[in-house]
């Protein structure tokens, strides 16, 4: 059975898998839970035929989780900037809950593709619930 390996298996981090524009897992994207059974990858992002800046400064297209991860990292950075009260664990929680496979995560797609608007709304609800206590 395949396992996600270090450093992607660390706790309290988001591990990002790569999908294509049809939402299909990329053949090069690691699969498998962690050695202690946690779901990894956490979520998926575009990593096949991703638009990147080429060596000539123009647009190029490339494949890899090395592209999926920074694409998703940028989205999460925007979410955290909008919701700076979130702890790391709360941030991961809203990302998981806002993903399309949240109800049935697996060791290929994790929690799936995240709807960042939904993640923002969940973060705002979490703040309202916390402020109301």
Residue ranges of predicted features:
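N-terminal low-complexity, intrinsically disordered patches enriched in charged
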Residues: 26, 73, 119-121
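Secreted peptidase-domain scaffold signal
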Residues: 118-133
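Residues at secondary-structure transition points
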Residues: 23, 38, 70, 116-118
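Catalytic-core segments of hydrolase enzymes
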Residues: 1-54, 96-99
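Short intrinsically disordered coil segments
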Residues: 31-33, 58-60, 65, 131-132
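Hydrolase catalytic cores
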Residues: 3, 47-109, 113
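Short capping/connector residues at structural and topological boundaries
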Residues: 33, 55, 114, 118-119
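Generic alpha-helical structural context detector
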Residues: 14, 41, 77, 93-96, ...
């Amino acid at each position: 059975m395949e396992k996600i390996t270090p450093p992607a298996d660390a706790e309290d981090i988001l591990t990002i898998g790569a999908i294509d524009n049809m939402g299909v897992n990329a053949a090069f994207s690691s699969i498998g839970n962690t050695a202690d059974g946690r779901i990894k990858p956490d979520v998926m992002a575009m990593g096949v035929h991703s638009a990147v800046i080429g060596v000539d400064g123009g647009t190029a297209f490339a494949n890899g989780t090395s592209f999926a991860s920074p694409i998703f990292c940028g989205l999460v950075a925007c979410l955290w900037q909008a919701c700076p009260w979130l702890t790391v664990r709360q941030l991961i929680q809203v990302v998981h809950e806002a993903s399309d496979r949240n109800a049935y995560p697996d060791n290929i797609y994790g929690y799936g593709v995240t709807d960042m608007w939904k993640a923002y709304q969940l973060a705002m609800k979490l703040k309202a619930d916390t402020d109301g206590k």
